Structure formats: structure tokens, C-alpha cells
């Protein structure tokens, strides 16, 4: 076949939508539509969170995460160089949700009892609306890894610091006593919210929050305040 005939044949094949096996035609994207990098990263974090909660860190696999996300494994590794890096990114995202929720709640009022209420409410809201984050932070199966343990400490210590700052500002207590109260309040809020969720929400969230607040306020009402 002459060069002219070959050229005509190739043009005919292109116009008809057909292609020879050896034609240099891009393969279709079998893994889904291409997303902007930030959007893809966010999607991978959501999918990875599901897998880590379902499987635990050790049983979770990068193959499964990539498959659920509809991407190839090399694409996953373009965003996260290892399973540990991915896990830490997932954990960091949930920690930020918890800490920002507590800070925002405490900034909404200057009334001390109401502050207690919104702080307790923030933990119940987090456990209800971000149960994956709750599992990863407070029921973590991988705290033997120093970087993971550090992230978990950030979650609790940041919340304690926020409560401690208000107690210190509003009371005549020395820093050690004020921090002990903050530790107790955060621990009680987490444990009560955890029980409420694990018991399949036996009472309404508002009743659970108010019960926790009443118990805590019984002790806090005896703390000397420099201002109301």
C-alpha cells in the first residue's frame, strides 16, 4: 500500500471513530473524572477515614483505599508517600474539627454556666456528627506510634487548654488547681458522650448534655470566681 493510501486509510478510521490497535490514541480514564489536586486530596482523606475506622490501621491497605476512591495506587502515592502519612493526615483533620468546635463554642458566651453547657455540647456534637473522628481519636489502636500518640494528645490537650484559660481568667485558683478542673471537665464530657453514643443514644442529646452539665456544675459552682 502506498504512503498516500495509508494516510487516507488513517483519516477514514479517525473520522469513523475507529482506531487500529497500534494507533497512538489516549486510553479513556477508567478510574473516574480527573479532580483538582486539593479536591482529590480531600476525597482521599474521606475514603481513607472510612477504611481506617472499618479496618484499623494495621489491617487497612492502600490498595483498598485507592480502589474505594476510584484512583490508581500511584495516584494515591502522589498525595501521600506512605500509609502512615495518610493516617496522620486523616487524624489531623478530625483533631482540627474537634478543637475548633470547642473553641468556637466557648467563644459564644461569657456566662459561666452557659460556657460549661456549650463546652459539653461541643463534645456531644463532635461524637454524634463525626463519629469516625471520635473512634480515631479516643479509641485509637495505633497509639504505640509516637506521631499518632502526639496527634491524640494534641486533641485532648488543646481542649483542656481552652477550658483552662477560661477557668484561670474567671477564678482565683492557682494554675495547677485550675488545670485539674479543666482536665476533669474534658474527661467527663468525653466519657459521658462516649457512653451516650455506645449505648445507642438511650436519651435525647439535649437531656444527656444537661445531665452532664448539672453534675459538673455542682462542683464548679463552689469554685471561687473573680467575676460572674
Swiss-Prot record:
The family database entries (SUPFAM superfamilies) matched by this protein are listed as:
Homeodomain-like, Tetracyclin repressor-like, C-terminal domain
What's the reported outcome of changing residue 106 to F?
A: Maintains a normal dimeric structure. Shows dissociation of the protein-DNA complex only at the highest acyl-CoA concentrations
Q: Which Gene3D superfamilies match?
A: Tetracycline Repressor, domain 2
DNA-binding region per UniProt: 61-80
Q: What does the subunit comment say?
A: Homodimer.
Q: What is known of its domains?
A: Contains an N-terminal helix-turn-helix (HTH) DNA-binding domain and a larger C-terminal regulatory effector-binding domain (EBD). A long tunnel traverses the entire effector-binding domain, enabling long fatty acyl effectors to bind. When the tunnel is entirely occupied, the protein dimer adopts a rigid configuration with its DNA-binding domains in an open state, leading to DNA dissociation.
| Name recorded for this polypeptide | HTH-type transcriptional activator FasR
Q: Which organism is it from?
A: Mycobacterium tuberculosis (strain ATCC 25618 / H37Rv)
